[in-house]
């Protein structure tokens, strides 16, 4: 078994250098760590991309097949920590590979309805959930400026503020790169109303 077996690609496309690097790291972790080997053996990736985060830093976005997402979630905290050790100064983010089906036009003869999970809105919301995974999204607000620009303000759970706080810039840059939408992440300020 080699690192190439960790990559699921269509036969027409060749794996990139980043794909091979991430796959090799997954394979090395599987072979070196006995306690993680059982969890890592069935896991595969579809692709990996480096995204410019700002300030000269980069993040690695690892795309995984949709059916394997739950298996990745089981060991994601430890896997992310190990991969971030190997890729110094880069944040690692796991996102499921999803497909957006176009909205059927007036002249298209479709035989079945487009599933909700394949709409643009559903895919973008799912990407947002994947990016912040260990943390839960508590609320969202869409702010529209007078010049027409929209900014999504996402409120995250306060319990994970210490573990995720330093990654918020990476999260917003990756989401903007993948979807084209501006987003800011915040932790809600606790007020003393219940006292």
Swiss-Prot record:
The modification Phosphothreonine is found at residues 146, 151. One of its GO terms (biological process) is rRNA processing. Keywords: Cytoplasm, Nucleus, Phosphoprotein, Ribonucleoprotein, Ribosomal protein. GO terms for cellular component: cytosol; cytosolic small ribosomal subunit; nucleolus; nucleus; small-subunit processome. Component of the small ribosomal subunit (SSU). Mature yeast ribosomes consist of a small (40S) and a large (60S) subunit. The 40S small subunit contains 1 molecule of ribosomal RNA (18S rRNA) and at least 33 different proteins. The large 60S subunit contains 3 rRNA molecules (25S, 5.8S and 5S rRNA) and at least 46 different proteins. Interacts with snoRNA U3. uS11 interacts with MPP10. Component of the ribosomal small subunit (SSU) processome composed of at least 40 protein subunits and snoRNA U3. Belongs to the eukaryotic ribosomal protein eS7 family. This is Small ribosomal subunit protein eS7. The lineage of its organism: Eukaryota, Fungi, Dikarya, Ascomycota, Taphrinomycotina.
């Amino acid at each position: 078994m080699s690192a190439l077996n960790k990559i699921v690609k269509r036969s027409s496309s060749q794996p990139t250098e980043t794909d091979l690097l991430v796959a090799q790291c997954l394979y090395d972790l599987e072979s070196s760590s006995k306690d993680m080997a059982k969890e890592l053996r069935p896991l595969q990736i579809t692709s990996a991309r480096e995204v410019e985060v700002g300030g000269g830093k980069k993040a690695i976005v690892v795309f995984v097949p949709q059916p394997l997402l739950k298996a990745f979630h089981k060991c994601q905290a430890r896997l992310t920590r190990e991969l971030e050790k190997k890729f110094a100064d880069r944040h690692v983010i796991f996102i499921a590979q999803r497909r957006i089906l176009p909205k059927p036009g007036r002249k298209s003869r479709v035989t079945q309805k487009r599933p909700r999970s394949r709409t643009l809105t559903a895919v973008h919301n799912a990407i947002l959930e994947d990016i912040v995974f260990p943390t839960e999204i508590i609320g969202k607000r869409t702010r529209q400026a007078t010049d027409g620009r929209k900014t999504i303000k996402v409120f995250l759970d306060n319990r994970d503020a210490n573990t995720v706080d330093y990654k918020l810039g990476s999260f917003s840059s990756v989401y903007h790169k993948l979807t084209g939408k501006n987003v800011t992440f915040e932790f809600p300020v606790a007020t003393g109303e219940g006292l």
